[in-house]
Amino acid sequence: MSDYKDTLNLPKTSFSMKGNLANKEPMILNKWEKQGIYKKIREHFAGREKFILHDGPPYANGSIHVGHAVNKILKDIIIKSKTLSGYDAPFTPTWDCHGLPIELQVEKKHGKAGQSISEDDFRKECRKYAKKQVEIQKKDFKRLGVLGDWEQPYLTINFDYEANMIRTLAKIIENGHLSKGFKPVHWCTDCGSALAEAEVEYADKVSPAIDVKFKIKDKDKLAQAFGLDSLNHDAFAIIWTTTPWTLPANQAIAVNNQLNYSLIKIEDFYIILAENLVEQTLKRYAIENAQIIATTTGNKLTGIIAEHPFYSRHVPILHGDHVTDDSGTGLVHTAPTHGVDDFTLGKEHNLSMEIFVKGNGCYSENTKLFAGEFIFKANDRIIELLGEKKRLMNSDKIKHSYPHCWRHKTPLMFRATPQWFISMEKQGLRDKALQAIKETSWAPSWGQARIEGMVKDRPDWCISRQRTWGVPLSLFIHKETEELHPNTIEILYKVAEKIEKDGIEAWFNADDCEFITETAQYKSVKDTLDVWFDSGSSSMCILDLDKRLSYPADLYLEGSDQHRGWFQTSLLVAMSAKGSQPYKEVFTHGFVVDEHGRKMSKSLGNVTSPQDIYNTLGADILRLWTASTDYKSEMAVSDQILKRTADTYRRLRNTARFLLSNLDGFNPVTDIIEFDKLVKLDQWAIAKTKEFQDKIIEAYDKYQTHTVAQLIHHFCSIEMGSFYLDIIKDRQYTAKTDGHPRKSAQTAIYHIVHALVRWMAPILSFTADEIWDATLKTTDLPIQLCEWYTGLKSFDQDAELDLEYWAKIQEIRSEVNRVLEIKRNEDVIKASLEAEITIYADKYNYKLLEKLGNELRFLLISSKADLKVIEESTSSSIAANIPGLLIEITKIEEPKCERCWHRSSTVGDNPQYKDICSRCVENITTEAGESREFA
């Protein structure tokens, strides 16, 4: 037996089978750094049409989690796909660097500002801490393969950014949107500060639910309201509340003029309830012998005076539009300093706005009975006191959704304080913002309705904070009237100039006289700006000012929580400062959860960290998982899910390796064969690749990364792995090295590789770089500077063997493979090359298959394939799952060729080569080798 190994075209490539990504990726990153790859991209695409994806700043505190990784990877994929489409698509990373979380970290080490450490030194430590956190996160983002201007990121602590925030505020004031107000705002006792809507999250809380009796002072007036002559017992207005701690601040009871109210006798007293709530309320009280005495409307009750349940204070009954008879009692306890509706009613009727609760959540010294107590702890004492005073009608517990601080996870209170607001109504900001939302493209589409609802119902934006680490509000107000200084705009621009030079410290360390001359009449405001104003100003501070970028951004892409956060604050800042929306399109992705749909939590032990993933599996696995997951909803990740992703990656890598290894000896300059002269199957491969490329580019353009990932996987596994590459192995390995059949396949492979590596590049950035290095090419450009491959061709419209034809051939081949598997399981054959395949076809299928002539066997990977009319079928033939087709498999008895392993009667025909077939002899001995037309 001769050794024919040297006569075969065995595959050869430098591209390894094993990814070994965790070790290789840092080396590739190092190469990119040395090449200055991001700078080269910017230079290469300078002057092209721009595409701007504006980065929403992550908070500079702690290592990145998998949600951060998903967000940056998705952005990177989109940027890279836009670059492939020929856009100048810069990516400038940003970071949010002011605010309470950083203050808290610095406090742990240095103590509170103004106590253990000076405020100036405290700010320096905050700045130092933020910069350190940025470097930690930056290293992780770069390790993920995210390309961007990492050397010049935008930090909200950059002096120019801080200054431009002040200039943005000046524009907002100039446009008439700023207002000062004494209003109830969400207040965190742990933060010691007001919170913006975006900083409030809702969680279940168990609260006391009590019904309180307010004794009616003038029974005769009440009797008259119900059309009665008199009342012979005391009467009580009943309110229901889940915040007993607000009762010291009660100033009124609200009813609705349009609702009906009932007077009910219970033993020796009367109570007032909304008519529609009588039955369920009495049931809640477990009272069965009550008697409804009379009914009246709410407008008859207004003006009647009640008595506070434990203070010597008169409480009027007033009309309130917010009062309903859906729940409670239909009479609403009103504490103007602790609720928005309460405050509105209080302003309307000039009720007392006395402050009973301090910023730390304790009652002030002027709060009788409870001075100094923490409000939530005082609930039990208040309930006890109501019982002693015989003013407690009912006491229960309720589990309900309650506002909590997003940082401390502790319950919030509504507290009226003097604050600065961006008014939603003053200059029609709400209506303008709602119109801008309509003019923006939202994906998923429900995002539009979500943000519309939020903007429609949101209160004025409280932008002032009582914190140390933040951009100063930089305002001066009159010491008596508290009106803004008449030269506020000029002063703000002056402040901005100083901050641009020395940072926010230039304000905090300056005397008022450095900015104004009228220090006897005016004083500076010590508040800082809401940290959401920092990030919300990014479109004004970055897009509108950086000539490398453009306003508005083409795309904002963040998590779905940003409808109430950055999407909304960006919109409000831009609309109030510039009068136009900051974005053309807004995309949201879901949160990352575990495989059971649970939120990531250390206590559950289900946290998947990006660092663990890239240090074990590699960043490309994390990138592939991110791209493969439909990010419009929750994104599930776990070790098992990542293992499946790694399996998918191996299939893609093996496909690339097979393609590359079969280009050995191919010269793309001299060996390329024109499309019309290729073997028909190779024409199909190129046309099919073109079809997939069109779909992939369309999916990238729609930011449908999961569709891209599915298409690439299907292309590699089905179109290539299960069909094309499986068929051409014989031709690649056994045909004459420089013969037409092999060069034809290599031409197709060359085109496929150049298309495939570009499809992969946005997602599998490290692997694509590795493939590119191993690819034959006629350019010195790195893959990051390439555009979509243009060397593919489609079939002409009149092509006989077009994509539709080959799709039918694939169906038939799948059926043949199914029957081959049956015969393998029956031990009739061990491999398909041992099979003699006979296909019995009706007229339609016969016509399809006969076009392939004697090359049908190569498509079926068998040694012999016969085509016969269906009428000749035998009892041993098996019906295909295609109408008009029967398949018969028998074991071929002819000898095996030791070179190509086909069974052939021609083995031994040539006395010089006794153990190989005539086809192999032809490939070894003749100048041209065998010829192929179809497969």
Curated annotation (Swiss-Prot):
Q: Which GO terms describe its molecular function?
A: aminoacyl-tRNA deacylase activity; ATP binding; isoleucine-tRNA ligase activity; tRNA binding; zinc ion binding
* Catalytic reactions of this protein: tRNA(Ile) + L-isoleucine + ATP = L-isoleucyl-tRNA(Ile) + AMP + diphosphate
Where along the chain is L-isoleucyl-5'-AMP bound?
A: 558
Span of the signal peptide = none
Q: Which cofactor does it need?
A: Zn(2+)
Motif mapping: 'KMSKS' region:
599-603
InterPro entries in the record: aa-tRNA-synth_I_CS, aa-tRNA-synth_Ia, Anticodon_Ile_BEm, Ile-tRNA-ligase, Ile-tRNA-ligase_type1, Ile-tRNA_ligase, M/V/L/I-tRNA-synth_anticd-bd, Rossmann-like_a/b/a_fold
One annotated GO biological process: isoleucyl-tRNA aminoacylation
Q: Which GO terms describe its cellular component?
A: cytosol
For this protein, the record's Pfam families field holds: Anticodon_1, tRNA-synt_1, zf-FPG_IleRS
Enzyme Commission number, as recorded = 6.1.1.5
Q: Which UniProt keywords apply?
A: Aminoacyl-tRNA synthetase, ATP-binding, Cytoplasm, Ligase, Metal-binding, Nucleotide-binding, Protein biosynthesis, Zinc
Recite the UniProt cofactor note for this protein. Answer: Binds 1 zinc ion per subunit.
Q: Which family does it belong to?
A: Belongs to the class-I aminoacyl-tRNA synthetase family. IleS type 1 subfamily.
Stored NCBIfam families: ileS (TIGR00392)
Q: Subunit details for this protein?
A: Monomer.
The job of this chain, per UniProt, is described as: Catalyzes the attachment of isoleucine to tRNA(Ile). As IleRS can inadvertently accommodate and process structurally similar amino acids such as valine, to avoid such errors it has two additional distinct tRNA(Ile)-dependent editing activities. One activity is designated as 'pretransfer' editing and involves the hydrolysis of activated Val-AMP. The other activity is designated 'posttransfer' editing and involves deacylation of mischarged Val-tRNA(Ile).
Q: What is known of its domains?
A: IleRS has two distinct active sites: one for aminoacylation and one for editing. The misactivated valine is translocated from the active site to the editing site, which sterically excludes the correctly activated isoleucine. The single editing site contains two valyl binding pockets, one specific for each substrate (Val-AMP or Val-tRNA(Ile)).
State what protein this is by name.
Isoleucine--tRNA ligase
Instruction: Tell me which species this is from.
Output: Francisella tularensis subsp. mediasiatica (strain FSC147)
Q: Which lineage do the record's taxonomy fields give for this organism? A: Bacteria, Pseudomonadati, Pseudomonadota, Gammaproteobacteria, Thiotrichales
Gene encoding this polypeptide?
ileS
